[in-house]
């Protein structure tokens, strides 16, 4: 007896999305009624660009801290293997527009005022690949993404 499994991200037509954007992938309700929201935080255009691992790794560490400073309920924000953005899992219901504002604010802080001392988890004790970071790359990518504007719609540009 085999179970039919559909992985939403493999069903998404990556040729028609318009990055940078935030997209609500879906919401799930747990057995006790708790809602979890899953977001596609796409920072660069799929199959046209990708963020180098060191810069993406640093953005990941910074977002882990900066998002939590701006909004309650973040469970996780993990990079896509294709290095074009992140999955973000949140408790509760949130709009794409609300999350796009949070991501924009985080990227502004990364681009404008973040120093190496601000990057959490960069020691051998706190990171599984602590040598693979680049604040320079993270800042440059944040500036580029911000210059393009972040949309709250994956298919039609609606820059927030």
From Swiss-Prot:
It holds the Pfam family LuxS. Keywords: Autoinducer synthesis, Iron, Lyase, Metal-binding, Quorum sensing. GO terms for biological process: quorum sensing. It catalyses: S-(5-deoxy-D-ribos-5-yl)-L-homocysteine = (S)-4,5-dihydroxypentane-2,3-dione + L-homocysteine. Binds 1 Fe cation per subunit. InterPro entries: LuxS_sf, Metalloenz_LuxS/M16, S-ribosylhomocysteinase. Gene3D superfamilies: S-ribosylhomocysteinase (LuxS) (3.30.1360.80). Fe cation binds at residues 57, 61, 127. One of its GO terms (molecular function) is iron ion binding. Its EC number is 4.4.1.21. Its cofactor is Fe cation. HAMAP family: LuxS. PANTHER family: S-RIBOSYLHOMOCYSTEINE LYASE (PTHR35799:SF1). Belongs to the LuxS family. Involved in the synthesis of autoinducer 2 (AI-2) which is secreted by bacteria and is used to communicate both the cell density and the metabolic potential of the environment. The regulation of gene expression in response to changes in cell density is called quorum sensing. Catalyzes the transformation of S-ribosylhomocysteine (RHC) to homocysteine (HC) and 4,5-dihydroxy-2,3-pentadione (DPD). Homodimer. This is S-ribosylhomocysteine lyase. It comes from Streptococcus sanguinis (strain SK36).
